[in-house]
Each structure stands twice: as C-alpha cells, then as structure tokens.
Amino acid sequence: MAFLALGINHKTASVDVRERVAFTPEQLVDALQQLCRLTASREAAILSTCNRSELYIEQDQLSAEAVLQWLADYHRLSLDELRASAYIHEEHDAVRHMMRVASGLDSLVLGEPQILGQMKSAYAVAREAGTVGPLLGRLFQATFSAAKQVRTDTAIGENPVSVAFAAVSLARQIFSDLGRSQALLIGAGETITLVARHLHEQGVRRIVVANRTLERASLLAEQFGAHAVLLADIPQELAHSDIVISSTASQLPILGKGAVESALKQRRHKPIFMVDIAVPRDIEPEVGELDDVYLYTVDDLHEVVAENLKSRQGAAQAAEELVSVGAEDFMVRLRELAAVDVLRAYRQQSERLRDEELQKAQRLLANGGNPEDVLAQLARGLTNKLLHAPSVQLKKLSAEGRLDALAMAQELFALNEGSTDKSLQ
C-alpha cells in the first residue's frame, strides 16, 4: 500500500495553466475510473477547485510518473509543461499534504473553511465512481478529523476571510460606499453565495444573481433580497452593474469584450469593477483591456488577502503541529494494518492445531483414558505443534548468521535475555 498526492495549485501554476488542468463536475466520475484503469491505481480521488487540481491515489507500488503522464494526456498538455507546475507528495508527505489542504493551511486565504467542504465533495464523488476503497477511505476520514481538530483547537478560522470576502474587500476599496452600488453575481454555487452574503452585509444597494437555471438563482436570491435572472439576461444587466463577480463551472467564457463594451457605452463609461473567480475563466481576459473596467482574477487577490495572513500566522503554527501529529498517527495505524493479515493467518493456524489436539484428547477420553494423562498429552502436543515452525525457522536463521532476526524473535516472543526455552533447542 502506498499513497500519492499529485497536482498543481495557485502557488505553482498561473490561472491560465490551472484552467487547462481543471476538471468539470461532469468529467469526474469517468476521469476517476479511467485514472485507476490506466495507471494501476487501486484507489483514487480528484479535488478540482479554482485554486488547485489534485489527485489522491493509493497504489501497490508508487508510479507517480504514470499518473503525471495520464494527467497531461487527459488535459492535452505536454508532460514537460505539466511537470513544470506540478508537485508530487508520497507516503507520509502525501498524508500530511491532504491534511494541510483540508485544514486550509495550503489555501490562498490561510484557514479558509470552504476547502474542507470541497474535499468532502471530492470524497463523495470518488465513492460514487467506485474508486475509493478501505485505505483511501481511512485516509479521508483521518483528514476530516484532523481538519476538524485544527478548526476547533486553534484560532485559524477567526476573522473569517475567503476568496469571496477578498473580492468584496477589493470592491469596498474601489467604491467607498457600497450602499450606492449595484452588483451582478454570475453563478449560484458556494463561492457566489458567500459573495452575496458579504455584499448584503455591506449594504450594497441592489444584487442580481444570474445563473444557467432560474430556479437555482431564485433560491440564492431569496436569501438576500436579490433579483434572479438567466445567463441570457446578463448583457442588459451589465449596463446597471457597478460590480460584477463571477464563479461558474462553465468551460467557455460567459462574458466577452463586446458585451462589456456595449454596456460601458450605455453607462457613459462609468467604471465597472469585475472579479473572475472561476477556473476556467468566465470573463475573457481581453475585457481587462477596456479603459473603464477593473478586472481581477483569483491570482490578483493575493495582495488583498496578505493582511489576513498576518492575523492567522500564529494560529497556523499550532495548526501545523496538529497536522503533523495527525499524519504521524495515521501512518502508525496504517503500519499496524500491515500486520493484520499475518496475525489472522497465524491465529487460524493456531486454532487448527488446537482443534486437532482437542479432537485427539476427546477420543482418548471417550476410550476411557485417564483425564490427567489426557490433559497433559493435550498440553504437550499443542505446545510442540505451536513451537515446531518457529523452531525450524530460528535454527535456519541462526545457521545463516542472522543475529538481527534472532534478536527480533526474542523481542517478538517477549523473552528476557538468557531465558531461552529448551523446547526451542
């Protein structure tokens, strides 16, 4: 059994690379099954967010290169291009990495809580695909426990900040009074829900939620007294929007330069602040070339969240220690599991020998044998049979000069020095 964590994130890859390596929700089940089939991976899960795409894998023997090649082929990248941005963690490091990610220690915004929910979703999809078994399943459960402990026992989650909050903070810097601004939110997922909540709390004058399905947009809009529209209505809403924040799972851009240009003319070139949180991007990069548009992507939010890092660094150190302990505890339990099959086989063998000797004793008693003699013979016979195989192997190891194995046997049988049983001679 061997664990592997492999991928790219906001620290190693630009948004351009990340959007090319992203998985859509519709791709995940098939991708997982293909990954296991083509890379000799027994278990696998995929975490794909706007800031990272990671594969979590359990293999009999580690084959990171095969997995990296599969990822490059799947997304039609050259292996060299992917390798330039990829990181690979194996065994203990892979376990620790997963726990750090789930705890928000590897996030763009240190300690952000959304990543844990995204990790749980990745686990659920892998279960649906049938690519999670007992080992990776145990690792996910240990990861969730570690993240929960970090959240409970440290201040990593205090002063909650997320990419959504960072986007709203940036809007507040550009528009000093959000109470006079109108916002258009594109999408209706978790990130846009957080954006809507923060804008609502800041007293933004009007919020419009645009989504592929009106039902989903309406459910979100009702929570914050907003208006729901379809994606097709975006061009006419743009003309009234001071703030546009987008986060969908679309594979193609939703907003192009022409639509924004037209809206600016209607606004008499009153500026529009835009944040594209999506990967792949929802807003064409060329939109940023327009004079009256302030377009930011997730990569541009680094400076906004920098202040948040300062307040959480102390808590992060304590969280790192908890994660290290959690990773080590998991590896200890995993190593203990390696002995389970051996112990099971040894117990079955011992019980078979016991049953054989017990049947002999029962026959002797049925034939009128003396109970004391029968019991003594039972004990003697069982002892000899249980010691036979270890005795043969120990003599062989001794003849080969394997003193290390003899010392291990002494520890295994909990023998004190000089207390060697004559029955082993």
Swiss-Prot record:
It comes from the Bacteria. NADP(+) binds at residues 187-192. Pathway: Porphyrin-containing compound metabolism; protoporphyrin-IX biosynthesis; 5-aminolevulinate from L-glutamyl-tRNA(Glu): step 1/2. The active site is at residue 50. InterPro entries: 4pyrrol_synth_GluRdtase, 4pyrrol_synth_GluRdtase_dimer, 4pyrrol_synth_GluRdtase_N, GluRdtase_CS, GluRdtase_dimer_dom_sf, GluRdtase_N_sf, NAD(P)-bd_dom_sf, Shikm_DH/Glu-tRNA_Rdtase. The record marks 97 as: Important for activity. Homodimer. Possesses an unusual extended V-shaped dimeric structure with each monomer consisting of three distinct domains arranged along a curved 'spinal' alpha-helix. The N-terminal catalytic domain specifically recognizes the glutamate moiety of the substrate. The second domain is the NADPH-binding domain, and the third C-terminal domain is responsible for dimerization. HAMAP family: Glu_tRNA_reductase (MF_00087). Belongs to the glutamyl-tRNA reductase family. This is Glutamyl-tRNA reductase.
